[in-house]
Amino acid sequence: MSSKASRLCVAALLLPLAFTGAHAQLRGHGGPVRALAISPDGTRAVSGSFDTAAILWSLTRNVAEQVMRFHDAAVNAVVFLQDGRIATAGADAHIAIWTPGKQTPDAVLDGHTGPIVDLAVSPDGKTLASASWDHSVRLWPLDGGLPRVLEGNAQNVNGVAFSPDGKEVISAGYDATVRIWKLAGDGVSVHNLPSPLNSVVIAPDGEIVAAGASGKVFFLSPGGDLRGEVEAAPTPVIQLAISPDGSLVAAAGIRGSVAVIDRKTRKLVRTLIGPGLPVWSVAFFPDGKTLLTGGTDRVIRRWNAVSGEPIDSAVVGAPEDPLKQYAGDHGAEVFRHCVACHTLTPDEGNKAGPTLWHLFGRRIATLPGYNFSPALKQLDIVWSKQTVSKLFEIGPAHYTPGTKMPEQTIGSPEERQALVDFLGRVTTK
């Protein structure tokens, strides 16, 4: 199956969506829901996924209004613009600007050289900020023109936000820094934190909230001084959301929970635990009491952020666990993080990534029918237990430069060995 055909098949699966009840969950993506945004009036949401698609949803009618297909890799960030349009950004380093109802983007913003993982709109609605793994932030004038490039991070920039007055841009990086960029000039202040950072949000009073690899949520003054911290999860926090009034912060953990924190008291109010976790994306409704979460099981759920309960616990058309037959196999559980993008059998074909059937002994970027990037085709790697283990030891971005694979490492040698042993058993039958 060609890459184009694969995308068309994914698109076909997105269209016949099913919903029940006034608060039914939203299902339609073919991979984990990586990004969420809710319109200012609370009537619409847009989601982005590892399946390379973005979906515009009506939250009043619980229907998918539009499937937006443009990106060649995971859609990592989505945002509503003040004029009603939508911006999507992906691991393909492109930003697309959409008018709802149109099948192609109004504009494509190019300039980044690595995956784009976060977007933010200035308070006046005139500028779009993007954070990228090329170690930069770019500020795009939405009325046209060249972007301003903010550089200085030593590693991936994972989060970006504007100050409430629009005079500053705040970035969070995997180099464990929060950077505050003065837009009226070239001034920047750098504030070091104890852990690599994955996300940043700004409260209406200007307080900076950042979180990352340690599982802690850090609270900084508008000037960057550390005011406090809350342990949200025992594993990395991958995304933050803040309620419109700034009273609550939601922290999505990579392995199984969403912590709801009272920003004023620095107290953990609730921990959301239920189906669909771990959570990749989270967003508050305008009421500040309701959350949307996007999970690994491809379903978007609504939660009462105050009580911690799902608003509707029924999942419509939830997919069967593709690893059910391997229950109890530790290697299969390690592989679960990869199952959204890769299949194990020839019958299942390709997903967002190529099938792993007969992986070992195959030269990188040579599987027929899959559209690999030119950069991967230049690499001299033959997949084996040793090379796959190395991939997850140092990360795809370092081992396979030019990849569109989400950045993920496995720190434990035992877990890496369990993974490659599992792949050896199930992909060579």
Could you say what each language-model-derived stretch is?
Residues 308-334:
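Electrostatic cytochrome c docking/interface patches
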Residues 25-33, 68-75, 110-116, 150-157, ...:
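WD40/WD-repeat beta-propeller blade N-cap
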Residues 45, 86-87, 128, 169, ...:
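Hydrophobic beta-strand positions that form the internal "hydrophobic ladder"
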Residues 331, 335-344, 419, 423:
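The canonical Cys-X-X-Cys-His
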